[in-house]
């Protein structure tokens, strides 16, 4: 039977100094026989998805203390990708994921913590904490801050729902007046919470629910709704029970690696494919799997993407539905319920409630369950009140969306497509694979061929788009923006958003070794592996080269002869120490980013550290 880890610092004469310090934090003699449970918060005033979390940690801590543990709270950093977007700040976004994972490890191991509750929400915070949980493998529960309500505005006598992407695209839309631009900006993000579409933050919070590490409703229940408070209170209670089950009952099944096993990862990926989630989730799931020593790779994702139907569209893939509508339709459990009826899920996986997925669906799938409490939770609705505070309203929908023919979540028979919302493409341009969110690709763009317009930075591509140098039929190539080449694998939200604003999103393609925001739509292909900085073929593309893309065939091909490619390769090698680096790019790379670039692997490996460089 495992001993409390915290005994290391709370027992024995030689730990007198440690106990003296613990006493200074408020612990008593009686507390030294209890479990120490970390409340890993991520409150910050920089991020709307985290602005409301200051007092939430205290709620969780109180429940831990009441239930028999000793709660100790600390904070991680949290970068707002939307604010860091479009300038050098985005270089720090993906590296912050690994920094968060490390900081959680440091705090947990330095203080010999027994278990933890992870309070996350936005883009890199949930993945960073997930990596830490699987690395540490101590009892853990995730509970996120919840989604933002969608914005609303009246334009040309039409009521329009808004999200962050609308605020970005309107900035260069010549049809939007300065007055309306200001109105959209002021209305797009009305409350605290993670941005209101199925962007990266909400996608990841849905996936922690599917992995079994978070409670039902975690991914979709609005940040402003009073029902969400119950998730935090329950997390404080449940973590004590989980930890006691492990430490006192020798129950190893409650550990993160046993809950989030390969079958759970496959369930989570099937959810992501079915709901057309962010391509960033692939990067983060691959990274988390490596931390948990789980054999889950791009090959598994490719296999799943070929059999899972696309059942759900939420902004940015449609303007009709936002996270509040997804929740009304049953949220994560609603989609998993449909996948279960397709016979696709591993129904025996277990969660933090010590229930199998099948048992959980029987209680939380609104299409088939009779549980009043569950259905009442999924009726939680927005209030339309601007606020930075959590739990301020109790609005409810008068009915749930159980329309599986044309509603937010659909059955297989009425799916948007029998192919899922994400696809892995292969070819000479991406020998190790690349990703496209097919949920955001118009049917007329499923097969595309065009001449390349090559840029060696996001900034250069944006300038080309805004100055009219991109034309219908072009394939925009943005390279040296991968994990190593950027470094930091910037999100290309501005190029894709500006293409949309200029009316080019339905007649152009964009490919990159960088990545995309969860807010991206259009024929946007990212994560090209190997990246240019790792001698990938994308580094040899010239202006005018024809690139063929065929989503149905899962292919992406550079139509240049092997003879020409050998000549180009030799010319690149001849550049000496400048080989496989961008030409004439003016970018200040800090020491911390250089260290990141030195250790990072490619996108198809999750952009995690190359352990071989550390182990020798």
Curated annotation (Swiss-Prot):
Keyword Metal-binding listed: yes
Domain of life: Bacteria
Matches recorded under Pfam families: ILV_EDD_C, ILVD_EDD_N
Pathway: Amino-acid biosynthesis; L-isoleucine biosynthesis; L-isoleucine from 2-oxobutanoate: step 3/4; Amino-acid biosynthesis; L-valine biosynthesis; L-valine from pyruvate: step 3/4
Record PTM N6-carboxylysine, positions in chain: 124
Keyword Lyase assigned: yes
EC number: 4.2.1.9
Binding, Mg(2+): 81, 123-124, 491
Oligomeric form and interacting partners: Homodimer.
Record-stated family: Belongs to the IlvD/Edd family.
Record protein name field: Dihydroxy-acid dehydratase
GN (gene name): ilvD
């Amino acid at each position: 039977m495992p001993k409390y880890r915290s005994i290391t610092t709370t027992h024995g004469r030689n730990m007198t100094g440690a106990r003296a310090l613990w006493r200074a934090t408020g612990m008593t003699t009686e507390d030294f026989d209890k479990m120490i449970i970390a409340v890993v918060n991520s409150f910050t005033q920089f991020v709307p998805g985290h602005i409301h979390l200051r007092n939430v940690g205290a709620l969780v801590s109180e429940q831990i203390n009441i239930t028999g543990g000793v709660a100790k709270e600390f904070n991680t950093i949290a970068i707002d990708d939307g604010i860091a977007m479009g300038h050098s700040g985005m270089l720090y976004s993906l590296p912050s994921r690994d920094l968060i994972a490390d900081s959680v490890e440091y705090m947990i191991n330095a203080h010999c913590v027994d278990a933890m509750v992870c309070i996350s929400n936005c883009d890199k915070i949930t993945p960073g904490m997930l990596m830490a949980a699987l690395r540490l493998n101590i009892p853990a529960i995730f509970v996120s801050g919840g989604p933002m309500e969608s914005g609303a505005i009246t334009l040309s006598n039409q009521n329009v729902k808004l999200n962050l992407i609308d605020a970005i695209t309107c900035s260069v839309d010549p049809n939007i007046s300065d007055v309306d631009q200001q109105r959209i900006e002021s209305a797009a993000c009305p409350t605290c919470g993670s941005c209101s579409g199925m962007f990266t933050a909400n996608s990841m919070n849905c996936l922690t629910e599917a992995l079994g590490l978070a409670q039902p409703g975690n991914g979709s229940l609005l940040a402003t709704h009073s029902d969400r408070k119950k998730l935090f209170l329950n997390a404080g209670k449940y973590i004590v029970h989980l930890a006691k089950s492990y430490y006192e009952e020798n129950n190893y099944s409650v550990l993160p690696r046993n809950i989030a096993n390969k079958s759970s990862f496959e369930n989570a990926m099937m959810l992501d494919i079915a709901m057309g989630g962010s391509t960033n989730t692939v990067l983060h799931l691959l990274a988390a799997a490596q931390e948990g020593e789980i054999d889950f790779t791009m090959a598994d994702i490719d296999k799943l993407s070929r059999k899972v139907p696309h059942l759900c569209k939420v902004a940015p893939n449609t303007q009709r539905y936002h996270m509040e509508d997804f929740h009304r339709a049953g949220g994560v459990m609603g989609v998993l319920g449909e996948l279960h009826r397709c016979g696709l899920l591993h129904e025996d996986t277990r969660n933090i409630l010590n229930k199998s997925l099948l048992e959980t669906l029987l209680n939380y799938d609104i299409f088939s369950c009779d549980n009043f409490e569950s259905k009442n939770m999924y009726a939680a609705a927005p209030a339309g009140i601007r606020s930075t505070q959590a739990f301020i309203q109790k609005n409810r929908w008068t009915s749930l969306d159980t329309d599986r023919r044309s509603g937010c979540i659909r059955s297989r028979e009425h799916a948007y497509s029998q192919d899922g919302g994400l696809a892995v493409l292969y070819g000479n341009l991406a020998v190790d694979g690349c990703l496209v969110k097919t949920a955001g690709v118009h049917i007329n763009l499923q097969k595309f061929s065009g001449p390349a317009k090559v840029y060696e930075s996001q900034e250069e591509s944006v300038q080309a788009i805004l100055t009219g140098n991109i034309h219908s039929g072009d394939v925009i190539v943005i390279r040296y923006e991968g994990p190593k080449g950027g470094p930091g694998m910037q999100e290309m939200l501005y190029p894709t958003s500006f293409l949309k604003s200029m009316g080019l999103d339905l007649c152009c393609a964009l490919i990159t070794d960088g990545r995309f925001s969860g807010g991206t739509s259009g024929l946007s292909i990212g994560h090209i592996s190997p990246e240019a900085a790792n001698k990938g073929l994308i580094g040899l593309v010239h202006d005018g080269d024809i690139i063929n893309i065929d989503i149905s065939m899962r292919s992406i091909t550079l139509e240049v002869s092997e003879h020409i490619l050998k000549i180009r390769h030799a010319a690149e090698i001849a550049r000496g120490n400048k080989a496989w680096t961008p030409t004439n790019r003016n970018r200040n790379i800090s020491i911390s980013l250089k260290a990141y670039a030195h250790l990072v692997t490619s996108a198809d490996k999750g952009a995690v550290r190359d352990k071989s460089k550390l182990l020798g």
